[in-house]
Structures are given as structure tokens and as C-alpha cells.
């Protein structure tokens, strides 16, 4: 049975039991700031289990993509550890409970119509106090010797829903391990008894202060189950490990072909296959390889896989070449991979190239931090923390070079850093405790700023930091949109903050008392411009996704009065031509003059009308209602910000700048409406200043015979094209100026050589002193000196180049040490200088000391 058939059978079975089929959620969690990845089938459904949301369906089944990297070091060493895996699940939210859940599991696993496992191959664990579960399994015909009670079969992760669980194991026989069910009882790592399914009966409210038997029963009981697809495939396909199933083996075969090495269970093959799947699925879901959080996890996986490739002789980037076989292996169930295949490969190639550059410098950096063939714990930590060299790579270098490392000290320093991080988190917690007054303030305050810019209102609360109004037109700094500016009874509001329970805190200099009536008004002009920029941000995002791909996700934004800023992920630099096309398409949307519609919907209505949208907005925190901003269907998004009423209000859109702010993250700054020309002029000002300086320099170099052509700047287009034009124009002028400088230099050199007799003494000796007072570029003087030195086969040439405010001394020699001569002489002239034996330079601003220097040199050279 193929993995595709296993998934389909699971879904088909539970659909026949009236379960709603839930599509796999993104690997990037929603509403889980402290969770890097979706790591279990229940993770995206927790909102239903904790009562935060009421599900539309009480019975749910799914095949959920998951990532866990906690046991990364075990991947490849064991048969079943993976960083990416698929969890098959069935869930009941206040519907069926123990008996039905156990019956469903029994039927699906043992019925010839479904998986058809021999009953005698199944072993079941249950919580030692849970006699109901024991009896249900017994009634279904499970041998009581195959029923194992365990004290630890109880699921709880702190206060909240908890309950006993029952685990189902498949016995693969004595050939995998001669020991028997003690392997299960003692929880020993083995390849004989494979845990294939865990069913959690969520029936109690966990109270850490009480023993389990004292827990209160939940009014609504739930079922949460999870079965590992990879493990089921291993059993149903009768393979030795998960890695020989069709979920990994096509990749391993591709690696065999690439390396010309036969797979016999090598760890490197397994690690590469596992990590590559994780990378492909994570990137497909919008994750970015960075130096922080989940991005760092992915970068670590990529580098670990790349290192394993080197063990197989793959010295050049290779992971990107394995994307097509990965997609081919998984596309039957995950069709979206096909759309992003090329993008994923490009991301991996880019990151592999970056890693190669890191490796080239890493070993050199490693060697620089050694002391007597030893790497101290301090330097180990420095290489890891400051230079970003992976721990395993440092250890590999040490092993290869036979270097002793103070690994224990490194770990101590690492723990210190982690503890400091925890301490900082504690400080933040303490700070939050100090805001207890905010947390306990529950009086509602109405925001009327979507439609009103001013209102008469009343002060309902006075804090040390500011006041809360009964109703307010002020928008706080939220969702990337900056706060409003304005006044309360002619008092300038300095800061607007949203309190924990949703009210708006207004900070300013002044005194008000509770119950006092006031007049609040915002800066209407600035608010409108902010709203236009917010709508423009939505349009920009849509066009970016159209032009670059659906993998584009917002990584940060700032919607202000003077401009907007949008940060996004992408795997390569965007060309100027593409940026111009993006700008053009945003303007085309603006010129369509379509209304911006706002919908306030209940969660239930929003799920019916915009289900896909809600799934895409992984970080949205839904309450009773959601606000949808709909711009003629080409841009539909959840948004609490203020917007234009029609795209025509934006008038015009101009990109001001584009830059890379970190690996794989780019930033566009743009502007719309009447701000366009003013903002563009401000951006062009530095270029204009640079162009002016270039022009002035060129004019200063011009001679009677040589003239520099100053090209006219192209006409202003009120577009990013102006930025591009200026950049190109300056680059062209810079290149032309370099050539002109060379031409001017050659002109002066030629003229000076033609007039060399004007600078030479009447009699040419092997030791010569020259003084030049005619103003020339120093490069010309040096060229002339070198010309004279070799033309007349001199032993020593000392040249004084006298300028109004300084003197430059040059010495070229075949006999005495030029550097020593200059160094000793300029000290007498209150100057400085030096050089090597054959060439030296010095100088002084004390021009009156010229004679002292010349007399010193004459004596040294013995010139009369």
C-alpha cells in the first residue's frame, strides 16, 4: 500500500464516520508566538479544544504536516526519528468519546476492508486507573496479555484539558528484537514494537496542585488522536526502517545516482533525505532561511545536510538538484509543491552558495583562534556565537586537525547565554506585572475613528501615563500602521497606545479628571495620507505575489504619513525592470478607480465566506468579529487599519527605494498621492549633490586642450525610473571622469617630460636633488621622478615638491636606504614619513624648514 493510499484510506474511513476533512494547515503556526512550527495534528485545532472558538464541525479528520527538531541528533541513527513527518488524526470536540474512538481505531486497523492488521500483532497500553478503556479493548477481542497498563499514560501539559491515553503498538516479530513486551513497559528504544497510534481522552481539567484522581471532569469531553504516516507506511510496505518507504526511498535512490554510492543504510543518506523534505515543505509554506528563530532552524538543517553530502563526496551545491524528485515523490497529495518547485530550488541553491562561502572563511577563522593546538571554551563560544560557525562544524575541524577543545567550558558559556535570555524574559514578565492596573481595567472604550475624525467625549479613566476616553477617533500604533496625531482640548497628544483589553490610552502633557467632557480631534490631513498608504500597501502586496510568486509573505511593514515600507521574503534580488513593472501594475490598479469595501463579519460568517483567507492569515488573532478589506476582489485581506474609500484617492504610486535588509528579506519603500513628487525629490537630492560634486571636480581638471563633456540628466518621470536613471547617470559620469582623469594625467606627464630640462640641473650626476615648485598632480610628479631616475641611470634621486602650504619629499634609490633617509630628514623639518629601501615619501607643513631638509640630504648624499 502506497503512502498516498494510506492517507486516502484514513480520510475515507473517517469521512464515512461523518468526520469533516480538514486540509493540512501551514507549518507556520497561527497565534502561537512561542511556537516555531506546527508540531502535532492537534496544534492548529487547539482553539477548539480550549474553547476559544466553536468549530463548525464537531468531528474532524486530517493529515497534518509537522516539524519537530528537538531530537535532530537522532535523525539517521534510528529507524523512525524525523524532522518532518505527517500526522494522521481524528478529533471529537464534545461529540463521541472513549468507546467510539476505540471502536473506530479497532475497525480501521483490523478490518480487511481497511488496513487489515492481524489482531495478534497489536499491543495496547492504557492508563492504569482507566478501567473503561481496558474493558472496551477487551470487549473487541484483544488478548488481555496484549493489554498493558502504564502509570505514565496520562496526557497533561499544565492547567487545562487533560486525560488518559491509549497507545497502539504493532509487533514486527522477534527478528527485530528477541525481547518481548518489556520493551513497551520499560519504554526501551527498539525496532520490534512500533507505536502507530495514540488516542488521548481529554476528560479532566488539570490542576497541578491536586493529584490526578482529584481532577474535575470537563463538561465537554474531547478526543485527540495521532497516527504516524511514516510508521504505518513502514509496516504496510514491510520495510526495515521508515527510510525505505516511498516517503523517503525515491530521494535516497536519487542520491545514489548522484553520488554513485550504493545505499546500505548510511546515516548521511537518511539525514539528507529527511532534512531536505523539511526544507522543501517549510519553504513552500513561506518560511525564510534567516539567522533567527525558525529561519535559523532551517539554515541549521540545510548546513547539516550539506555537510553530510560532503561525506558522500558532494563538494558542490546539490540539495537544490533534489527538489524535483522530492516534489515528484509528494505531489500526489501536496499538489501545491509543483507551483513552487522552481522557487524552492532557487532558495536552496542560494543558501548552499552562502554556506560554501562561510565554509571557505570558517576554517581560516577557526585556525586563527587556536592557542598552542588548543581551542579554548571562550574561543569555541566566540566562533559559534559571533562568527555563526555551527557547533558540529567546529568539532569536525578540531577532529580533522587533531585539536583539543574545551567543550565543557563552551557548554557552560552557552548555558549562561540561555539563562541570561530567560532572565531577560523574566524582567519582561516583571515589567508586565507593573502594568497590572492596565490589565484590570475593563471599562469599554469605543473607537470611532474609521468614520469620524473628531468628537465630544468623556474621560473614563486617568492613569499616570495618560487617559482613556469613552469614545475616541485616535488610532493606536497597530498592524504596522502608525498612530494618529491630534489634540484633546488643544493639548497635543504625544503617544497613542492600545491597552491589553482593547482601550486606547492617550498620552500628553496636561491634566484631566475622570468624568470631564473633552473634545478630541486628529490631524485629518495626516490620517488621510496614512490611510492612502495603507491601501497602497495592500495593492503592493498583491502585485508582488503576482510578479514574484505566492511564496511572498509580509515580514514587517510600516504605514506612515510620509511613506510606506513593506518587508518581504524572496530568494533573489529583484531586477530594476521588475520593480518598474511592479510600480506600473500598482498604478494600473489605482487608475481602475474601484471602491475599497469594508466588511465586519462574525467568525462563523467569515469562515463560510472567506475560509481560505482565514487560513492564510496565520498570525491573525480572531475575536467575535473580523474586519475584511476588499478592493474589487483583487485584494481581499483581514485588516484593522484605516483605508482610502476608493483607489482613485491614491492618485499615483512611486517606489522610492529597494534594498536587502537580511538574508532572503527585502524592503520596498514607496509613497502615493501628493507626497510622490516631494518624497521623490528628497530621495534624488543625494544623487543630485553627488552629480554636482562630480561636475565640479571635472571642471577643476579641465585644461585649455581638454574638456569634460557633462551629459544632461533625463527628464523627471515621477517614477522609480528617476532613481534608476540617476544611479545610471552618476555611474556613467563616474566612469567618464575616471577616464578623463587618466587623460589629464597623461597630458600633464607628457608636457612635463617635454619640458624636463627646465627642472634638471646643468650637470647630471648619479646622485641628484631636484626641487619643483610648479603646481602639478602628485601622481605626475612621481611619474616624472621615476622617468628621470631610470632615464639617467641614477643611484639616488631626492625630489622636493614645494606647494604653498606643504612640502612633499620623495626619494628613489639603488644604494642607500631611501626610507631611513626620509624618516631621519623629515624629523628635522618637523614632518613625518618613511618607506622601504628603494622608495620613500615624507612631508611637512613647516615650509620654512625646507633648507634644513635640503642641507641634511646634501650632507648625506655628499653633494656640493
Swiss-Prot record:
<dbReference type="InterPro" id="IPR050058">
    <property type="entry name" value="Ala-tRNA_ligase"/>
</dbReference>
<dbReference type="InterPro" id="IPR018164">
    <property type="entry name" value="Ala-tRNA-synth_IIc_N"/>
</dbReference>
<feature type="binding site">
    <location>
        <position position="534"/>
    </location>
    <ligand>
        <name>Zn(2+)</name>
    </ligand>
</feature>
<dbReference type="InterPro" id="IPR003156">
    <property type="entry name" value="DHHA1_dom"/>
</dbReference>
<comment type="similarity">
    <text>Belongs to the class-II aminoacyl-tRNA synthetase family.</text>
</comment>
<keyword id="KW-0067">ATP-binding</keyword>
<dbReference type="GO" id="GO:0004813">
    <property type="term" value="F:alanine-tRNA ligase activity"/>
</dbReference>
<keyword id="KW-0030">Aminoacyl-tRNA synthetase</keyword>
<dbReference type="InterPro" id="IPR018162">
    <property type="entry name" value="Ala-tRNA-ligase_IIc_anticod-bd"/>
</dbReference>
<dbReference type="GO" id="GO:0000049">
    <property type="term" value="F:tRNA binding"/>
</dbReference>
<feature type="binding site">
    <location>
        <position position="643"/>
    </location>
    <ligand>
        <name>Zn(2+)</name>
    </ligand>
</feature>
<dbReference type="GO" id="GO:0002161">
    <property type="term" value="F:aminoacyl-tRNA deacylase activity"/>
</dbReference>
<keyword id="KW-0694">RNA-binding</keyword>
<dbReference type="GO" id="GO:0005524">
    <property type="term" value="F:ATP binding"/>
</dbReference>
<dbReference type="GO" id="GO:0008270">
    <property type="term" value="F:zinc ion binding"/>
</dbReference>
<keyword id="KW-0648">Protein biosynthesis</keyword>
<feature type="binding site">
    <location>
        <position position="538"/>
    </location>
    <ligand>
        <name>Zn(2+)</name>
    </ligand>
</feature>
<dbReference type="InterPro" id="IPR009000">
    <property type="entry name" value="Transl_B-barrel_sf"/>
</dbReference>
<keyword id="KW-0963">Cytoplasm</keyword>
<keyword id="KW-0436">Ligase</keyword>
<dbReference type="InterPro" id="IPR002318">
    <property type="entry name" value="Ala-tRNA-lgiase_IIc"/>
</dbReference>
<comment type="function">
    <text>Catalyzes the attachment of alanine to tRNA(Ala) in a two-step reaction: alanine is first activated by ATP to form Ala-AMP and then transferred to the acceptor end of tRNA(Ala). Also edits incorrectly charged Ser-tRNA(Ala) and Gly-tRNA(Ala) via its editing domain.</text>
</comment>
<dbReference type="InterPro" id="IPR018163">
    <property type="entry name" value="Thr/Ala-tRNA-synth_IIc_edit"/>
</dbReference>
<dbReference type="InterPro" id="IPR012947">
    <property type="entry name" value="tRNA_SAD"/>
</dbReference>
<feature type="binding site">
    <location>
        <position position="639"/>
    </location>
    <ligand>
        <name>Zn(2+)</name>
    </ligand>
</feature>
<keyword id="KW-0479">Metal-binding</keyword>
<dbReference type="InterPro" id="IPR023033">
    <property type="entry name" value="Ala_tRNA_ligase_euk/bac"/>
</dbReference>
<protein>
    <recommendedName>
        <fullName>Alanine--tRNA ligase</fullName>
        <ecNumber>6.1.1.7</ecNumber>
    </recommendedName>
</protein>
<dbReference type="Pfam" id="PF02272">
    <property type="entry name" value="DHHA1"/>
</dbReference>
<dbReference type="Pfam" id="PF07973">
    <property type="entry name" value="tRNA_SAD"/>
</dbReference>
<dbReference type="InterPro" id="IPR018165">
    <property type="entry name" value="Ala-tRNA-synth_IIc_core"/>
</dbReference>
<keyword id="KW-0547">Nucleotide-binding</keyword>
<keyword id="KW-0820">tRNA-binding</keyword>
<dbReference type="Pfam" id="PF01411">
    <property type="entry name" value="tRNA-synt_2c"/>
</dbReference>
<dbReference type="GO" id="GO:0006419">
    <property type="term" value="P:alanyl-tRNA aminoacylation"/>
</dbReference>
<keyword id="KW-0862">Zinc</keyword>
<dbReference type="InterPro" id="IPR045864">
    <property type="entry name" value="aa-tRNA-synth_II/BPL/LPL"/>
</dbReference>
<dbReference type="GO" id="GO:0005829">
    <property type="term" value="C:cytosol"/>
</dbReference>
